[in-house]
Amino acid sequence: MSEMVDLKEFLAELGKTQKELKNVIEQAKDIGLELKTNSKMTPEQAGKLYKYIVDGIKEQIQANQPAKNPEQDNKDDLNTAVASKSLNKKVFKTPKKEETKSQPKPKKTKEKKKEAPTPIAKKKGGIEIVNTFEDQTPPVENAPKVVSHSQIEKAKQKLQEIQKSREALNKLTQSNANNANSTNNANNAKKEISEVKKQEQEIKRHENIKRRTGFRVIKRNDETENETENSVTESKKPTQSAAAIFEDIKKEWQEKDKQEAKKVKKPSKPKATPTAKNNKSHKIDFSDARDFKGNDIYDDETDEILLFDLHEQDNLNKEEEEKEIRQNINDRVRVQRKNPWMNESGIKRQSKKKRAFRNDNSQKVIQSAIAIPEEVRVYEFAQKANLNLADVIKTLFNLGLMVTKNDFLDKDSIEILAEEFHLEISVQNTLEEFEVEEVLEGVKKERPPVVTIMGHVDHGKTSLLDKIRDKRVAHTEAGGITQHIGAYMVEKNNKWVSFIDTPGHEAFSQMRNRGAQVTDIAVIVIAADDGVKQQTIEALEHAKAANVPVIFAMNKMDKPNVNPDKLKAECAELGYNPVDWGGEHEFIPVSAKTGDGIDNLLETILIQADIMELKAIEEGSARAVVLEGSVEKGRGAVATVIVQSGTLSVGDSFFAETAFGKVRTMTDDQGKSIQNLKPSMVALITGLSEVPPAGSVLIGVENDSIARLQAQKRATYLHQKALSKSTKVSFDELSEMVANKELKNIPVVIKADTQGSLEAIKNSLLELNNEEVAIQVIHSGVGGITENDLSLVSNSEHAVILGFNIRPTGNVKNKAKEYNVSIKTYTVIYALIEEMRSLLLGLMSPIIEEEHTGQAEVRETFNIPKVGTIAGCVVSDGVIARGIKARLIRDGVVIHTGEILSLKRFKDDVKEVSKGYECGIMLDNYNEIKVGDVFETYKEIHKKRTL
């Protein structure tokens, strides 16, 4: 049977996918080949289809026929054998492919060559060309590719012979009208005539197409010339002869095909050999039948020689060069298998290049510079840096950090990865992903300066601002200290100045930092009688980081014995030289109590603002910064904001982090309602969905839908970030968790009146944690204490609910007693932090110290039945007391630690024995005492820990 080529295998060799199957089937129809998804083709059909797809050479072929049963094949072969007797030139492919190629099918428009019987006699003892062969396909079908003039003459001669055979066929048709085989042969003859005519036309049109490689010439016996006319009428004898011929040829070529099965798809260049037996490196294609006489089979292959056409040597050289080029390309893309239709192909090369690119995905090109958000997931970092995700995770693992692909990377991790992979990282603001594009075009107009007042606690910052505003805010603050960030507008010389008052307590460091980030000028208030303190230095660092000019206000100048020069000297040591000392920083003496120096301070601020030429765009959507957020009864969530650009009006939609809404009302620091908020102006706004985090950016948008969408995106991002932080753990943290499995935790829920105060309390409490006890913040929020807060800690031991500037309701108090949960409220942050510090100290174990008391050497041992071993000792140092702890040391190694159960001097029990005296010592539950051992006594001293 003929070896068939599966369509799927054909697609794979072409480098095409199943999605391109439809296109291949359509192209097959163009050359007369009907294919389906699971169809198979002969190598001939596959070769022609391949040439049509790759090179565009369209050769009409017989459509693919379904496999036939052997009986039908034999009948067709017999019919072919009858017709073959009248022809002298036969061309056929490998006999293994006869079964599907030799059968005529009248319904098809194109068929393989089956020549009609012609009673034409040849000269006796002559030489005839039995067949020609090419590199790949039969010569009849590839006739348009012949360029030799001798071949053109052969084709013309063949046309004349077929015309003569048609005349003989007409006579045969009249005498055998009922013979179905004759009808088929007549159809074949007509088709052969039309094919040869087409071939002659194609020969004239094509002159530079691949040549035939040679001719097969066979010497005939004389007897074969005498019976050509009678062979047609004697149909029974040829029938038997054809069957035998078919079987013999099939057996002969089956053996050859077994040896050449692997070489069918790898054609080699034909070599000139004297016999066909030695020509095993390539196949000689034959037609479906051969001219035999009766039962006589011509098998003398020694009379068969090969003649090569040397006129086409130039074309042959070109073919060899093309084959070498194709071979080099195949070697480069590592083609592992070849077949007759995978010899030359741009498509093949393109496909292999694609495969090679897919295989090299692990070796991605690393970018030299990339832009990375401040907080990015591991897989996002790999995508942006064009790195392999597994390599990134492996690198972090080797550095001691276990992460998943969805975990977030902090700034340190990004820098480490950049160094490991030799990348240049440009860190971008995370908020930019969620911001709506701002209107950057517009006329910039002058805006008021934003001034932040900072300094140490109790140095008079709020009192100074109260004097400027003629208000008394300091008296309304609990404990007389500022615990909220405040924003105010002050008019001086028909010019407005926005003041931001920040807390001076150490717990409010982030509030001071936020104030410095939105300010234009920083006023550092220092008490002249106290000098530079810790929070003063911190405030200066915030101002320096924000790159804003600093003005020093020397407060409390009304007090006696103040020394401003000492204060200036302390600031000069920090690098801030006064103007009168040749520096560039203004030091203004003021008194918040008497008001002295206030006008001078305001004028200095306005002069500095004029020098800075502060301007901003008033048109377009507003961009503001949330200074503080809280929940007010009857108003819901409110926020104090300061506008940086654009204009915020009542009714505008906005979003800030996870909060969104529409501005319902706006009130200034005097409590007056306003409609518009321009750059550098501050106001309290309502209409928020929730309390926004302090320091978040508020963006004005077109409508509520955009605001809600942006807030939801930000909420999803923050939620995933929180999950990532809960799953990330380093090796050090993991080992610490194992070592501290007895770690004592205090679960707390923190509720405060404002977002800034809540943030300060959380940070201060977390700083109290140590290796033994820790505060675990289960929940925190702005607003009153609710029953839900109680349920969060109802099952926890030592749980505490902390309230700052809020009071629980009656129902909440009753539920707290039911759940046995402690609620503690405070109005001053000092008291809250100190009480939590004491609570942690109570849970911590005391520090144990040892005090050496005495030492005794064993001189003798006495074993007393039912009592134990008593050691006779001499006290060499200190005092040995009964009941004290002792270590038994042998050769410098402690072998036992226990208490002295009995201490005797001679026969009397004693409480203690001093240095230089002898005594008897017996340990509690230990008798392995030897001469030469040493007793070392000590006592433990317990001391309280401090945080």
Swiss-Prot record:
Extent of Basic and acidic residues compositional bias: 151-169, 189-206, 247-262
Region (G2): 480-484
Residue stretches making up the tr-type G domain: 446-615
Keyword Protein biosynthesis recorded: yes
Annotated region described as G5, given as residue ranges: 591-593
Region annotated G3, chain positions: 501-504
Short name of any one Pfam family annotated for the protein: IF-2
Region of interest called G1, as start-end residue ranges on this chain: 455-462
Region (G4): 555-558
GO cellular component, one term: cytosol
Chain residues that bind GTP: 455-462, 501-505, 555-558
InterPro entries assigned: EF-G-like_DII (IPR053905), IF2_II (IPR044145), IF2_N (IPR006847), P-loop_NTPase (IPR027417), Small_GTP-bd (IPR005225), T_Tr_GTP-bd_dom (IPR000795), TF_IF2_bacterial-like (IPR000178), TIF_IF2 (IPR015760)
Keywords tagged on the record: Cytoplasm, GTP-binding, Initiation factor, Nucleotide-binding, Protein biosynthesis
Annotated spans, Disordered: 61-284
Subcellular location: Cytoplasm
GO MF terms, alphabetically ordered: GTP binding; GTPase activity; translation initiation factor activity
Ranges of Basic residues composition bias in the record: 207-218
Sequence ranges of Low complexity compositional bias: 175-188
Function (record text): One of the essential components for the initiation of protein synthesis. Protects formylmethionyl-tRNA from spontaneous hydrolysis and promotes its binding to the 30S ribosomal subunits. Also involved in the hydrolysis of GTP during the formation of the 70S ribosomal complex.
UniProt record similarity statement: Belongs to the TRAFAC class translation factor GTPase superfamily. Classic translation factor GTPase family. IF-2 subfamily.
Name of this protein: Translation initiation factor IF-2
Organism: Helicobacter pylori (strain P12)
Organism phylogeny: Bacteria, Pseudomonadati, Campylobacterota, Epsilonproteobacteria, Campylobacterales
